[in-house]
């Protein structure tokens, strides 16, 4: 051995070639060992990986390598989420075909991922734009259609005027398209929908089973599904005020207890009664048209200014036939939630209060907080939505004053269920969900074609299974926005599979979130040409044991995947309903920003930073021009605060980048990119190499074990090794990689101390200590292998092992070594903790008392007062009473 510096540039490619040549990460589906499936969300092939990818895939790789070392048959695949608008945008901007652009990017990014040393089974690789993949997606669409899980219907949709496509509600962020940033409009189109709402209750209740998911993700899904219990309430209408003598309007409410506070009824702009009234009211028609210029997403509607139009129609209050409420058309009422109509109780709903304050309708509080005087309780600008007792809620029909909200709801429900309007009860109990069906139609080329043919005679006809896949044509033009498939001269013209007559293909393609809603199941057997899955294999390998990705996908991707898995189960493609047993959401990689004098951003590579006392000053490298150091933000191309992984790997090596990503902060929090932190990680790589290099010549052969029970130094080393092994396993099992890293820093220091204190002439002069050191250094290399695999391979070879550390099994923890002969007890004085005392585990009470009273903290707390008694709870706590 030599003490030369570790050369990552030479070492890392060499070990990567060995892994590839031996296909050691290829998973065998018939392996009898217990399986473990770890998966990071697969990337969109945008062109290059970024530091967020490095962090995400490093975390997954640590889990995969650790579980493999523990004896599991690990599935750790990789593929590409390859359809989507960016490819079409690139085609328009650069005159390149989306397919060429996509596959070129895949080649680049695959090489980058390989340079990270990830333990991926590349034999299972696919891109969602491969016809061999989307063939099966088309097959499942047809199966879902036959099972009643797909529907084609007219619908108001979110239209992105820049991307010229439809967006799901979840893809509208603050009123703008999630990719283009354009203000979204409403349009009425015929669309294909997956009937996710059919599973609303199941998707909600099953969240309780997902105990290895973050609470915040489950809460987000619960809120999005939005279960609410209430009343379907029928308001009679004054027929003298309705356009065609309509007699009633139905309202869904979760707060029937507040009916005495009602001030108006509001209709969605798309409500049939609103449409009928608009026929004879041009001003109302214009208002409705204005409402349609905003998107259909709930979040956008909630934040928009509340606007309404008094239709002149009057509704009759169900508690009093002489009490009439004005009927408005309002921009905040959604047609596809409930009935498309609401009653407004402004005192107890902020949206309604904003509305009545704008239109001068007034408000009447009907719930009073406990402890407030009902006679003086008023609401002005802030609605009261808390608990309390009913007030102002008595008449000859019903008396609610003094009731709790729950009791009042029940009383109203029973009273209105017992009376009729026409031949039906005025009210009936109903459960509603916020979740709406998933519109999957997209008016673009680069997506999975929907396998449908439209025939004037036969109607909607699925493409025969034998004719799948319906492939995208290559000869398309991107000379203007819109869907090139609509303009293609031949592709869409086909014969009807049923009657043979002239027909046309469906030119909409599927939302790209469909592609990512089942890829994890396809990874289990991507070689099956006849079916999306091989049941025996997918049911054995799924669900994914550990899924890793960003919290931004909590609703979009994760909820869609849960639905899609249920749909696959219903059509016989899988035998389970939940795709991900464990879910982990990692934090982002962030970096400070740098703004030049002209207001534009500079990249970190263009900046020099120097310390000036307590301040840091930044300037441009080329001109020396001062630069403002801005806030720390998510790495993004627009802020130019990105760091190229290739530069870091080229300068320091992949292991340094991996170690930094794992060590700097808890994995669920953002990590601040720091050049100093990277340099520190690089120093640790060299530190480990120096330790191994120095110790290797002094070690006995691999496998040497000698009894260390009567050798204090050797026994202490074995205790440290197995304690660290236990701590690292616990850290990785909890995905607390930063704590595992911290334990390794401590352990390396302990091994360095052993080397420094070795007998003169080295460890070889003490065979028992040398044997313990052999075991300890083996464990060190095994423990760093999931995190710094290239360095670990180099060290494994250096200490005399013939195989690859990536194929080595971790040793079993000797639990007897983890039992300490001492115990640390908290010490209280008069019930308040003052310190701790460490005593022998078998110490008797007099020994414990003496040790406690000798503590300076106890003496200070007693302040000369006599000790009345000492209470010792064995193995738990000591309390001194003074």
Swiss-Prot record:
> Which spans of this chain does the record mark as coiled coil?
none
What stretch of residues is annotated with the motif 'KMSKS' region?
634-638
Q: Where in the cell is it found?
A: Cytoplasm
Alphabetically list the UniProt keywords: Aminoacyl-tRNA synthetase, ATP-binding, Cytoplasm, Ligase, Nucleotide-binding, Protein biosynthesis
Q: Which GO terms describe its molecular function?
A: aminoacyl-tRNA deacylase activity; ATP binding; leucine-tRNA ligase activity
The source's superkingdom equals Bacteria
State which Enzyme Commission number(s) the record gives.
6.1.1.4
Query: Pfam family example for this protein?
Result: tRNA-synt_1
| Locus of motif 'HIGH' region | 43-53
Q: Name one GO biological process term.
A: leucyl-tRNA aminoacylation
Q: Where does ATP bind?
A: 637
InterPro entries assigned to the protein according to its UniProt record, in alphabetical order:
aa-tRNA-synth_I_CS (IPR001412), aa-tRNA-synth_Ia (IPR002300), Leu-tRNA-ligase (IPR002302), Leu_tRNA-synth_edit (IPR025709), M/V/L/I-tRNA-synth_anticd-bd (IPR013155), Methionyl/Leucyl_tRNA_Synth (IPR015413), Rossmann-like_a/b/a_fold (IPR014729), tRNAsynth_Ia_anticodon-bd (IPR009080)
- Gene Ontology CC annotations of this record: cytosol
Q: What does the record give as the reaction this protein catalyses?
A: tRNA(Leu) + L-leucine + ATP = L-leucyl-tRNA(Leu) + AMP + diphosphate
PANTHER family, sorted: LEUCINE--TRNA LIGASE, MITOCHONDRIAL, LEUCYL-TRNA SYNTHETASE
As for family, the record states: Belongs to the class-I aminoacyl-tRNA synthetase family.
HAMAP family named in the record: Leu_tRNA_synth_B
In Swiss-Prot or TrEMBL terms, this protein is called Leucine--tRNA ligase
Q: Which organism is it from?
A: Rhodopseudomonas palustris (strain BisB18)
């Amino acid at each position: 051995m030599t003490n030369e510096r570790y050369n990552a540039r030479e070492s890392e490619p060499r070990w990567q070639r060995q892994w590839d040549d031996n296909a050691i990460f290829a998973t065998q589906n018939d392996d009898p060992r217990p399986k473990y499936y770890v998966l990071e969300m697969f990337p969109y092939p945008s062109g290059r990986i970024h530091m967020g990818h490095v962090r995400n895939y490093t975390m997954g790789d640590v889990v995969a390598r650790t579980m493999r070392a523990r004896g599991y048959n690990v599935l750790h695949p990789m593929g590409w989420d390859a359809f989507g608008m960016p490819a079409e945008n690139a085609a328009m901007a650069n005159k390149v075909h989306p397919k060429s652009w996509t596959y070129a990017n895949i080649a680049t990014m695959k090489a980058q991922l390989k340079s990270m040393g990830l333990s991926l089974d590349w034999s299972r690789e696919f891109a969602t734009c491969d016809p061999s993949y989307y063939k099966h997606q088309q097959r499942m669409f047809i199966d879902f259609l036959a099972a009643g899980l797909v529907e084609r219907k007219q619908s108001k949709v979110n239209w992105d005027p820049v991307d010229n496509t439809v967006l799901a509600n979840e893809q509208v962020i603050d009123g703008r398209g999630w990719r283009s940033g354009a203000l979204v409009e409403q349009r009425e189109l015929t669309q294909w929908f997956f009937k996710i709402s059919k599973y609303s209750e199941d998707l909600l209740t099953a969240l309780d089973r997902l105990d290895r998911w973050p609470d915040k993700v489950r809460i987000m899904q619960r809120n999005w599904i939005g279960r609410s219990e209430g009343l379907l309430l029928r308001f009679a209408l004054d027929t003298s005020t309705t356009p065609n003598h309509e007699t009633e309007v139905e309202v869904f409410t979760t707060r029937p207890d507040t009916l005495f506070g009602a001030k108006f009824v509001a209709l969605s702009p798309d409500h049939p009664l609103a449409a009928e009234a608009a026929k004879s009211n041009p001003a109302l028609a214009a208002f409705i048209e204005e409402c349609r210029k905003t998107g259909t997403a709930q979040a956008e509607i909630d934040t928009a200014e509340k606007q309404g139009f008094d239709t002149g129609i009057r509704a009759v209050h169900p508690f009093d036939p002489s009490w009439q409420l004005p009927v408005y058309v309002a921009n905040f009422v959604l047609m596809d939630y409930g009935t498309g109509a609401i009653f407004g109780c402004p005192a107890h709903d902020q949206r309604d209060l904003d509305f009545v304050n704008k239109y001068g309708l007034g408000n009447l509080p009907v719930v009073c907080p406990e402890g407030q005087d009902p006679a003086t309780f008023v609401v002005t600008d802030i609605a009261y939505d808390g608990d309390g007792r009913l007030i102002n809620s008595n008449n000859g029909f019903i008396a609610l004053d003094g009731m709790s909200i729950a009791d009042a709801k029940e009383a109203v429900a029973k009273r209105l269920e017992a009376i009729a309007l026409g031949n039906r009860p005025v009210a009936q109990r109903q459960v509603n969900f916020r979740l709406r069906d998933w519109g999957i139609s997209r008016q673009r080329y680069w997506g999975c074609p929907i396998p449908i043919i439209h025939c004037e005679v036969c109607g909607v006809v699925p493409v025969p299974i034998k004719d799948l896949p319906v492939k995208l044509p290559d000869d398309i033009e991107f000379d203007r926005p819109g869907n090139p498939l609509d303009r293609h001269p031949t592709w869409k013209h086909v014969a009807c599979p049923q009657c043979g007559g002239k027909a046309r293909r469906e030119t909409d393609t599927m939302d790209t979130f469909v592609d990512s809603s089942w890829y994890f199941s396809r990874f289990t057997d991507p070689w099956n040409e006849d079916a999306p899955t091989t049941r025996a294999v997918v049911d054995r390998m799924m669900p994914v044991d550990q899924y890793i990705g960003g919290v931004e996908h909590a609703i979009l991707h994760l909820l869609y995947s849960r639905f899609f898995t249920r749909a696959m189960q219903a059509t016989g493609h899988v035998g389970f309903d939940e795709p991900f047993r464990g879910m982990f959401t990692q934090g982002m990689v962030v970096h400070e920003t740098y703004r030049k004098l002209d207001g534009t951003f500079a990249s970190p590579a263009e900046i020099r930073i120097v310390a000036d006392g307590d301040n840091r000053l930044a300037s441009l490298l080329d001109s020396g021009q001062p630069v403002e150091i801005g806030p720390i933000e998510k790495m993004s191309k627009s802020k130019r605060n990105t760091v190229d992984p290739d530069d870091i790997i080229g300068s320091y090596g992949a292991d340094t980048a991996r170690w930094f990503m794992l060590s700097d902060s808890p994995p669920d929090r953002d990590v601040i990119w720091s050049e100093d932190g990277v340099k520190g990680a690089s120093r640790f790589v060299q530190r480990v190499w120096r330790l191994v290099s120095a110790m290797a010549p002094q070690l006995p052969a691999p496998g040497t074990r000698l009894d260390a029970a009567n050798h204090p130094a050797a026994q202490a080393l074995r205790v440290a090794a197995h304690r660290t092994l236990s701590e690292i396993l616990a850290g990785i099992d909890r995905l607390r990689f930063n704590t595992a890293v911290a334990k390794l820093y401590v352990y390396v220091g302990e091994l360095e101390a052993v080397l420094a204190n070795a007998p003169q002439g080295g460890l070889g002069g003490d065979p028992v200590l040398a044997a313990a050191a052999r075991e300890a250094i083996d464990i060190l290399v095994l423990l760093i292998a999931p995190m710094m695999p290239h360095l670990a391979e180099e060290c494994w070879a250096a200490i005399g092992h013939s195989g690859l550390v990536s194929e080595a099994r971790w040793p079993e923890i000797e639990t007897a070594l983890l039992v300490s002969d001492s115990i640390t007890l908290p010490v209280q004085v008069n019930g308040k903790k003052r310190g701790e005392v460490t005593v022998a585990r078998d110490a008797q009470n007099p020994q414990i008392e003496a040790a406690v009273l000798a503590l300076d903290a106890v003496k200070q707390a007693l302040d000369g007062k006599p000790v009345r008694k000492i209470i010792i709870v064995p193995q738990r706590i000591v309390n001194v009473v003074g």
